[in-house]
Design a protein with these regions (language model features):
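Gly/Thr-rich phosphate-binding beta-strand-loop-beta motif of the actin/hexokinase/Hsp70
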Residues: 1-12, 119-138
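Short beta-strand-loop/turn "lid" adjacent to the catalytic site in phosphate-handling enzymes
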Residues: 46, 50-85, 89
Length: 260
């Protein structure tokens, strides 16, 4: 994805495109992700060019890694970093580096009209295919937002669980939207018992539970509902645990899974 922000009007122009994933597969190998990023990013930037006609570039920002923690690395980020460095060098403007996770949190605040929340500490959740994290967030003059990890999934991530269950039910990756639509066809009540370890959670059992339900002949809609309810109850339990540790701070939920 790529976007332009007009600092005078606050207007945002964005372009985004999902990376292609073959039917039946749960994601991409890193080498394939790098290839598709390299091929698609120039196309997105070209679509934004008309909005630059009367507005010079004054800065470039890029996500350089998944999270602001030591050892956080994925090769596909190099494509964006290389492109951003080239644009900044050619235009002679500053380059601002951030992380994918900080971007998710700030984007959620922006879309909710709550950017002012960055002025005080708050809790955030980043729930996606690669993370199920509770985060302690506080103001930072250099990085706009300082994020300290609080809790996480000790095994399977929420988005991984949703996609694996979705593929199990014959849905196309990424499965979140279709799984939600399927779950809405069910009204079956479930007693969910999330697995919590302090401020952390465990989700690997969810996949096994859903597979067992499928083998026992339970309707796909009921399985989809059970899957999403389990993820929701897990996040609720993690929220309570995070607030017990850090106090009753405001809570923000971000990431692809939170749209389901």
């Amino acid at each position: 994805s790529a976007a332009l922000l007009d600092l005078e009007t606050g207007e945002v122009h964005q372009e985004k495109q999902l990376l292609p994933v073959k039917a039946g597969e749960a994601g991409l190998r890193q080498s394939d992700a790098v290839f598709h990023h390299t091929r698609q990013l120039p196309e997105l930037l070209e679509r934004l060019r008309p909005f630059l006609a009367e507005n010079p570039v004054c800065g470039v920002s890029v996500s350089t890694r998944p999270r602001n923690v030591d050892g956080s690395y994925m090769p596909c980020f190099l494509t964006g970093v290389g492109t951003a460095r080239a644009v900044a060098a050619v235009t002679g403007v500053p380059l601002y580096e951030t992380s994918h996770q900080v971007g998710h949190v700030l984007a959620a605040l922006y879309s909710a009209g709550k950017l002012g929340a960055c002025e005080k500490p708050f809790l955030a959740f980043h729930v996606s295919g690669g993370t199920t994290d509770s985060l302690y967030c506080e103001p930072d003059e250099q990085a706009a937002l300082k994020i300290t990890p609080c809790g996480t999934s000790l095994d399977l991530k929420a988005g991984q669980a949703i996609d694996r269950v979705g593929l199990m039910l014959g849905l196309q990756f990424p499965c979140g939207k279709a799984l939600e639509q399927l779950a809405m066809q069910s009204r079956k009540p479930f007693r969910i018992k999330p697995v919590i370890r302090g401020v952390d959670c465990c989700l690997s059992g969810l996949e096994n539970q859903c597979r067992k339900k499928l083998e026992q002949g339970e309707p796909p809609a009921d399985i989809a509902r059970f899957c999403l309810m389990t993820v929701a109850e897990t996040v609720i339990a993690m929220t309570k645990a995070a607030q017990e540790r850090h106090g009753k701070l405001p809570v923000l939920y971000a990431g692809g899974v939170m749209s389901n």
